[in-house]
Amino acid sequence: MFHLAPDIINLNNVTFSYKGSKRKALDDVSISVKKGECIAILGPTGAGKSTLACIMNGTIPCFIDGNLTGQVNVDGLVPHEAGTAQMASRVGLVFGDPDTQLFGMTVEEDVAFGPSNLGLEYREIMKRVKKAMADMRLTGLERRPPHRLSGGQKQATAIAGVCAMLPKIMVLDEPTSMLDPEGKARVFSIVRMLKEELGATVILIEQEVDDILGLADRVFVMNSGKFMLSGTPREVFSQTDELRNAGVRVPHVVEFGGLIGADVIPFTIDEVLETVKSGSWSRPAKPAESDDARNSSSGESLASHNDSEPIIKVRSVEFKYPSGAKALDGIDLEITRGDFVAIVGQNGAGKTTLTRHFNGLLRPTSGEIEIMGRSAIGVPTIELCSHVGYVFQNPDEQLFCTTVEEELGFGPANIGMDKSMISSRVEAILNDIGLSKYRDVWPKYLTKGERQRLALASVVAMDPEVLIVDEPTTGLDWIESCQILDYLEDLRAKHGKTIIIITHDMNIVSLYARRVVVMARGKVMGDGTPQEVFSQPDLMALACLRRPSIADVTDALWGEILLTPADAAQRLFSGKTTHVEV
């Protein structure tokens, strides 16, 4: 006789408001999760996803105060009554910001901390640590202090530390937001292993919708503290309008199926190819809505973008940290004025290290850098910063004023801008970024997306010719991500700014970048348009990158790299024959 697995998580009519806030972060939420299930929770920033995660292991309200009502039962315990110490052995929680849970002197010490507190023998602890570090590509970094890791390596360390505890329940709150595409794939592979081999229950809070299709048993979509949609991946992702309204990006294969009027919406690349091969589609009379109406669909070569003069020149640059580790190895690069460049590559490839040389935050061990035709050697950082603005990956690292308005005026005042000009620039930028109503608000009270916009705007206020943004979309939902990138593109197209982004998001690269610089092991390994880079599988593998799924589809169908589902649908409607039998 078949028996259903018992519920391991039960939340009934749970409502929560943070201390001092009248807004309900969770509003009458109920959910049951069976042992061994993988549940994906999607939704915009501020929907209540992280609040839900913290309630499951007792962090709320044990450490984060507020008003909690309703019933919560996790593995037979009430988390806030059992306490976080007892819950930690049952529920492993990985936060989206790794700095909140890294505190060891070395990577190995950090990964070993959790299993060491389970009373295990030393040999078992080190066995788990070694495996977890290997799974997360951290082998060789055992003795490195966590503060000297890249953002992605920090995130990998936090995940490894929780995995080493082998908890019954894994709650992963945007665990891949800082990881390169191969790192993301490894995390999802580990999730699958935990579920299938160890019987673990997994709660996965994510923005990476393409990977969820084949991983989650059920999907829940949250908005404004409530569940708006729930069901199997096919049931949920078929409701494309509702997903867009909730700030969730529709997977490329699903969007393409809708655009071509597929008889049955495909959910894998193989299903897309079979749909096209069998002719199980008909061009809709009214075109379906597309998420990717921006791009750059052309197949222009890089040469067509190189008419402007270089604004940044890098010649034979090497950089070594005080430890002797070489982070940059013979870099030669030119960035032309008015370009939109994405610098991509695996975690630790040297992307951030390179770009911090452009405004003097770092100085090369050897080699030369020219900014606007002038050698950067000996030029004070404050002078370079007036020409090359830098937005850090974590906005909280550069927000420190007491109000939003003061934050926007700080940089311009520092570089000697006239008071009347500062006032007019601040007013204009407040309107541009949609933060006028928050002018007198303390920045820490803003959402992550609002803080990201403020950090960007505080640099834009200084009117630099070059703007570097390190991971502009980390922790943001799809709507917020596009708002940030649309703003950057507007600065380039209308004001002639040169934009450089560092990103792991190939969907963002395909939509916005005119040029892609690929780094690996401290070197520039490739340079071209998105189409040119995505058409080089060896280069993509070397840099631990994965192209958007629609590029895989169009490559298989026509031997072409197209960047959006809309482009692919138009190509199909053109009636040209397929490249291969599918």
Model-assigned labels for residue ranges:
Residues 42-44, 344-346:
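The feature captures the beta-strand-to-loop junction immediately N-terminal to the Walker
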Residues 57, 359:
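Helix-to-loop junction immediately C-terminal to a conserved catalytic motif
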Residues 65-77, 367-375, 384:
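Conserved ABC transporter NBD signature motif
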Residues 123-141, 420-438:
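Conserved ABC ATPase "signature" region
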Residues 145-149, 153, 442-446, 450:
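Conserved ABC ATPase signature
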Residues 170-173, 467-470:
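Catalytic Walker B motif of ABC-type/P-loop ATPase nucleotide-binding domains
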Residues 224-225, 521-522:
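Conserved ABC ATPase "signature" C-loop
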